[in-house]
Regions:
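A glycine- and Lys/Arg-enriched "phosphate-lid" helix/loop adjacent to the NTP-binding pocket
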Residues: 114-159
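ATP-dependent small-molecule kinase phosphotransfer cores
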Residues: 49-113, 137-138, 160
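Walker A (P-loop) phosphate-binding loop of P-loop NTPases
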Residues: 32
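Conserved lysine of the Walker
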Residues: 35
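NTP-dependent small-molecule kinase module
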Residues: 1-20, 41, 45, 91, ...
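Hydrophobic anchor at the beta1->P-loop junction of P-loop NTPases
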Residues: 27
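Hydrophobic positions on the alpha1 helix immediately C-terminal to the Walker A/P-loop
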Residues: 38
Length: 199
């Protein structure tokens, strides 16, 4: 039995997908917030595809995010990231996990607003620091003091992340509990009160 079919919230999930129409659920937030892991579970719950924007960028470029940063720099990466997200937004409904800097682009935010519903997975510095220590593929954290870099990025980004349609705290609880909160929050959004989505 599928997770969608077996979960108590399955009927609401079906109604939510109907309300989404062609819109995507776009997860935004810092590296380490859980966008990919929670996104996969959310997509399974809703029975729609999960897409990781970073993976799609790597596929399009034929190199890893680290390699793109090293060879071309962050501005080049951000331009490619914006193009890939615009393309992906045309193929909803889906759950789309975006890179930490993607939502900082006003053009990308406008595209997400037009073609999706944004969900900020908000996490504390402590949680992010603990989670990102496990990963070596974070180009923005390659300096001598990743904790200070995380703090600076939080200070720079959180006011913009707060413009998302929905905010859910990412914390050390079972992922299904966070998925439950996302589903409940999406169901309550006025933007999803009427079915259809972007034409």
């Amino acid at each position: 039995m599928s997770e969608l079919a077996s979960h108590d919230d399955a009927p609401a999930g079906g109604a939510l997908v109907t309300a989404l129409g062609r819109r995507s659920v776009v997860l935004v937030g810092m590296m380490g917030a859980g966008k990919s892991s929670i996104g996969r579970r959310l997509a399974s719950r809703l029975n729609i595809p999960f897409v990781d924007a970073d993976a799609e960028i790597e596929k399009a470029a034929g190199m890893s995010i680290n390699e793109i940063f090293s060879a071309h720099g962050e501005p080049y990466f951000r331009a490619g990231e914006a193009r890939v997200i615009l393309r992906l937004l045309e193929s909803g409904p889906q759950v789309l996990a975006t890179g930490g800097g993607a939502f900082m682009s006003e053009d990308t935010r406008e595209a997400i607003r037009a073609k999706g519903v944004s969900v900020w997975l908000r996490a504390t510095l402590e949680v992010l620091s603990r989670r990102t220590k496990r990963r070596a593929d974070r180009p923005l954290l390659k300096g001598d003091d990743p904790q200070s870099t995380l703090k600076r990025l939080i200070d720079e980004r959180y006011a913009t992340y707060a413009k998302a349609d929905l905010t859910v705290d990412s914390r050390d609880v079972p992922h299904d509990a966070i998925v439950d909160e996302i589903v409940a929050g999406l169901r309550a959004l006025p933007v999803l009160a009427t079915p259809g989505g972007a034409p």
